């Protein structure tokens, strides 16, 4: 597993101006068994809110993780903050206390509402937490993290997958074992308020025939 002592697993590198990429890896427990802790929507806005999250919830997760045998990872399924981007720095500092790598998912409240457009609104998130779309292996299985928040501006967003995300999944799947269990980790559930998501049918068509579990919050 990539080094995660910064609060976010360092499995990625910024490519601009570089032609060599070195990664510090840590050996995981042997065997194919694993555990996943999935949490969502801490939605902390004030320092007092965050102190509550960093108290009993983090302590409980650390206790649970300490009882695991074998590999273990955590997923935080979006809305780490409530429209306060500096909370992400506080989160990174505290989540390492759980004792396992925690992988983030972007939520609608992790965007900057004052900016216009999906990429601009999530730029600060990317700088602190890494890419919005990525995948990693655990045991023989694979976790696929997707951004299904298409942000506009001023708290307005569309739920679904951009064409770019769909193309990324399409290119990823041939690289994955067909017998692997896939966990799709995303912020909004598939059936959002009784409505389908933008490009939902395209995603499900790509995943057809696979063993898939969706993990979400919102």
Predicted regions and their residues:
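N-terminal active-site segment of His-dependent metallophosphoesterases
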Residues: 4-8, 12-89
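Extended active-site neighborhood of metal-dependent phosphoesterases/phosphodiesterases
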Residues: 11, 85-170, 176, 199-211
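Active-site-proximal beta-strand elements of phosphoester/diester hydrolases
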Residues: 33-44, 140-150, 183-187
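Active-site glycine-centered loops adjacent to acidic/histidine catalytic or metal-binding residues
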Residues: 41, 78-79, 107-108, 187, ...
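Surface-exposed cleft-lining segments at the edges of enzyme active sites
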Residues: 44-46, 79-80, 150-160, 191-192
